[in-house]
């Protein structure tokens, strides 16, 4: 009986240790096709390498949250870090700015990465 209790405690301790590892997300913002003003495209925000899995991701147009956004299922890499892709259809113009805002437990404040139309 005491051996099974010891194994159960050991298992719980090892599981709780997994939660202690925190990794900051890497954020990449890019369009599916080269940017052309007035031409429909897709804006992508790829967030990877983060742990734990709880994360908030928003796509922004001129600092305002874009409502119609889709995303992939939460997936994990072989190192147990997580990744997601958020995307939306958009039509770039000369004056509009686009960005991705990410909030995660490893960040002291939400991180905003702007889309560079020349990338």
Swiss-Prot record:
Record InterPro entries: B2Microglobulin, Ig-like_dom, Ig-like_dom_sf, Ig-like_fold, Ig/MHC_CS, Ig_C1-set, MHC/Immunoglobulin
Functional summary from the UniProt entry: Component of the class I major histocompatibility complex (MHC). Involved in the presentation of peptide antigens to the immune system. Exogenously applied M.tuberculosis EsxA or EsxA-EsxB (or EsxA expressed in host) binds B2M and decreases its export to the cell surface (total protein levels do not change), probably leading to defects in class I antigen presentation.
Annotated disulfide bonds: 45-100
GO cellular component annotations of the record: cytosol; early endosome lumen; early endosome membrane; endoplasmic reticulum; endoplasmic reticulum lumen; ER to Golgi transport vesicle membrane; external side of plasma membrane; extracellular exosome
GO BP terms, alphabetized: amyloid fibril formation; antigen processing and presentation of endogenous peptide antigen via MHC class I; antigen processing and presentation of exogenous peptide antigen via MHC class II; antigen processing and presentation of exogenous protein antigen via MHC class Ib, TAP-dependent; cellular response to iron ion; cellular response to iron(III) ion; cellular response to nicotine; intracellular iron ion homeostasis
Disease named in the record: Immunodeficiency 43: A disorder characterized by marked reduction in serum concentrations of immunoglobulins and albumin, and hypoproteinemia due to hypercatabolism. Patients may suffer from recurrent respiratory tract infections and severe skin disease. Amyloidosis, hereditary systemic 6: A form of hereditary systemic amyloidosis, a disorder characterized by amyloid deposition in multiple tissues resulting in a wide clinical spectrum. AMYLD6 is mainly characterized by gastrointestinal and cardiac symptoms. Neurologic involvement, sicca syndrome, and carpal tunnel syndrome may also be present. Inheritance is autosomal dominant.
Keywords: Amyloid, Amyloidosis, Disease variant, Disulfide bond, Glycation, Glycoprotein, Immunity, Immunoglobulin domain, MHC I, Pyrrolidone carboxylic acid, Secreted, Signal
Signal sequence extent: 1-20
Source organism, top-level taxon: Eukaryota
Residues annotated with Pyrrolidone carboxylic acid modification: 22
Similarity field: Belongs to the beta-2-microglobulin family.
Cellular location(s): Secreted; Cell surface
Protein name per the record: Beta-2-microglobulin
Organism per entry: Homo sapiens
Principal subcellular localization: secreted
């Amino acid at each position: 009986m005491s051996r099974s209790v010891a194994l159960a405690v050991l298992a719980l301790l090892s599981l709780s240790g997994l939660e202690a590892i925190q990794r900051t997300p890497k954020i990449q913002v890019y369009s599916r096709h080269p940017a052309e003003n007035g031409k429909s495209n897709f804006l992508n925000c790829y967030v990877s390498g983060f742990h734990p899995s709880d994360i908030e991701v928003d796509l922004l147009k001129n600092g305002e949250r874009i409502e119609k956004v889709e995303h992939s299922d939460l997936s994990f890499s072989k190192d147990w870090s997580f990744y997601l892709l958020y995307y939306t259809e958009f039509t770039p113009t000369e004056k509009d700015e686009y960005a991705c805002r990410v909030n995660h437990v490893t960040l002291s404040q939400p991180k905003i990465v702007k889309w560079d139309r020349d990338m």
